[in-house]
Each structure stands twice: as structure tokens, then as C-alpha cells.
Amino acid sequence: MNLAAMDPNTYDAQLEEKRIKLEQIFTDFDTPKLEVFSSEPAHYRMRAEFRIWHDGEDMYYYMFDKALDSKVRCDQFLPASELINKVMPALMEELRPNPTLRHRLFQIDFLSTLSGEILVSLLYHKQLDAQWEIEAKALKEKLAATFNINIIGRARKQKLIIDKDFVIESLTVNNEQLQYHQIENSFTQPNGKVSVKMLEWAIDVTKNSQGDLLELYCGNGNFSIALAQNFDRVLATELAKPSVESAQYNIKINKIDNLQIIRMSAEDFTDAMAKKRTFRRLEGIDLDSYNCNTIFVDPPRAGMDPDTVKLVQGYDRIVYISCNPNTLIDNLAELSKTHKITRFALFDQFPYTDHMESGVFLERR
């Protein structure tokens, strides 16, 4: 991470560079005007990870700065949420003088929410015992006087939870509240306010939809829960078990009654739709009963494999969220043969970095 590049005074300029770069990448495609959704210039990351450096009696957070090729002390961290920045010194003040909690501590992870909850994970190169648990409970009790906080201790093949291993995020999307169960050590959108803009964009491009929605790679249901209002039914797939459990939880707390989550990979689901194989996980689910005219995909950085691209091409309307414009371009080379891009967006999830989150909405030619 290049810490020197994180200067709010340069935010607008770096976003403009991304806009120009993304438009250049898409030169070979007929795209509408690029919609650009900016981030807060500071305190935008809802999660952060720090290594811990021990220096005699002192102990502090640090990160490795690639530009300097060295570690940099981080008593505060500009990109992290204001809540993380408030908890960082308060936590360290309690850890430094506590031999049980500081011994062989090598990393601290923070997961915060816009709604004011924070989860702190303490990672150790030692096994955690009953004394550690006593001290950690006392630590939580002291910090809980100021913060809505929970603590996790992690070591090899060990996880101790005090008292929860998740947070509940509450997002205001088009003036409505959506709640999301976010579990420790699983994927969540890092930039909370930009995530809201992404949800609102996806709702907008799919308004006035007919029929049902299929979503691949649904994670904790982040998009499918928000989009359920636009469709008769939603069928979503996700492979990671913790994410599926969170998605089921989120369906309940948001009182969504038209969303079905299936735990399976996009590749396996592609085989199931093509009737190449049968899967026990699909027992009781009549895929043929769904009338999916729209498909939503948010694949990993590697993009979609050729078979999944072929599956996606079978739908009249495609919403594609991408964290890697290069693999998006690769997939669009095939998708654009049958579909045209009618909406095009840049979401600045990761300010001051080269990463670009983009979205395209395609309709059959």
C-alpha cells in the first residue's frame, strides 16, 4: 500500500485519472456516457488490517508501504472509518501493559459499520488459554463503555469469540433501511457509502423489470436483497458457506419473501441449468419454474469462465459488476456479440489505488 498517495487534496485528480483510464480500456466498445460515483476522500474503508510491531515496552500498528519498501507506523489510518480510528488508540492503550493479551500478538483486524458497530480480531502466534479469555472479556467490558464492540481471538486452529463474530450493518438505500449480517473473515464491501451507490445504481438499471432475477456469486445477499423489490422472484447462488449463512440471516431480518439462496458454485449451477448433472442441493427447487429474464453477476477478479459466459448470454438483460476491468473486457468480447451496453458506471471503491470497480448493464440486441 502506498500511504503517501492517500492525500484528500488529490482525490478529485486521481478519480479523473481512473475515469480516463476506464474509458480508454473500453475504446473498442460502444458505450453510453460513463456514470462516475465518487467516494469520501477520507475515512471510507469499513475494514482494515494491521500488523503489530513489538519494540521493548512499546507496541504499535504498522503497514508495509510498497513505495518506501519499508514498514510504516500507523497510530491512525486516514482511509479507515472514523470509528476504526477512534478504537485504534483506545485498544492499543489497553493492550500494551497487558502481558497476556500482547504476548505473541502479530496482527489486528477491524470490521466496522456505518451503523456504529465494530468487531476486533486479535491474531496470535500462540494458543489461547483460559487466562487469555478472562483478560479479553475484561478488555471488551472496558471498551464497551465507549464503543459497540466485540472481540475475537485467533490462533492456529483456534477461534475464541467475545461475544459475537459478526456485525449488523444498516444501509440507507433510496431512503429505505437494509440490514446486513457481516461475519468476521468473510467478504464484505469495503467502502460502505460507495456500496450504497452501487445498490442504488443496480436498482435503477433494473427498474420496471419483468419476470425473475438470477444472481451468481451473491455473497451475503448484498445485491439480491436490494434488488428483490424489482422482480417477482430472485434465485441466487454462492459457494462460500459463511456467506450463504449470512445471506439466509439477511433474508430474515429484511423480511424478504421472494429470494431463494442455493449453495453452489457458478460453474456447477451452469451445469445444472444445462442439465449436464443433477445436484442434491437442488432437490425441491424447480429451476424450470423460474422465468429469469435478467441475470446479475459480480464475479471474482478472474472473471467468468467460458461456460458461465455462455449461460449469461442466454438472458435478455445482464447486470455485470466487476472488480477487474481487464477480465470484464475479456467477457464482454463474447457478450457484446449478442448484447449491447446501455449503462456504464465507475464506482470508486478503492481511492488512491489502481483498482477500479465498474458496472455495465447489457440488453439483448
Swiss-Prot record:
InterPro entries: MeTrfase_TrmA_AS, MeTrfase_TrmA_CS, SAM-dependent_MTases_sf, TrmA_MeTrfase, U5_MeTrfase_fam. Its EC number is 2.1.1.-, 2.1.1.35. GO terms for cellular component: cytosol. GO terms for molecular function: rRNA binding; tRNA (uracil(54)-C5)-methyltransferase activity, S-adenosyl methionine-dependent; tRNA binding. GO terms for biological process: tRNA methylation. The keyword Ribonucleoprotein does not apply. Pfam families: tRNA_U5-meth_tr. Keywords: Methyltransferase, S-adenosyl-L-methionine, Transferase, tRNA processing. Disulfide bonds: none annotated. It catalyses: uridine(54) in tRNA + S-adenosyl-L-methionine = 5-methyluridine(54) in tRNA + S-adenosyl-L-homocysteine + H(+); uridine(341) in tmRNA + S-adenosyl-L-methionine = 5-methyluridine(341) in tmRNA + S-adenosyl-L-homocysteine + H(+). S-adenosyl-L-methionine binds at Q189, Y217, N222, E238, D298. The active site is at C323 (nucleophile), E357 (proton acceptor). Dual-specificity methyltransferase that catalyzes the formation of 5-methyluridine at position 54 (m5U54) in all tRNAs, and that of position 341 (m5U341) in tmRNA (transfer-mRNA). Belongs to the class I-like SAM-binding methyltransferase superfamily. RNA M5U methyltransferase family. TrmA subfamily. This is tRNA/tmRNA (uracil-C(5))-methyltransferase. The lineage of its organism: Bacteria, Pseudomonadati, Pseudomonadota, Gammaproteobacteria, Alteromonadales.
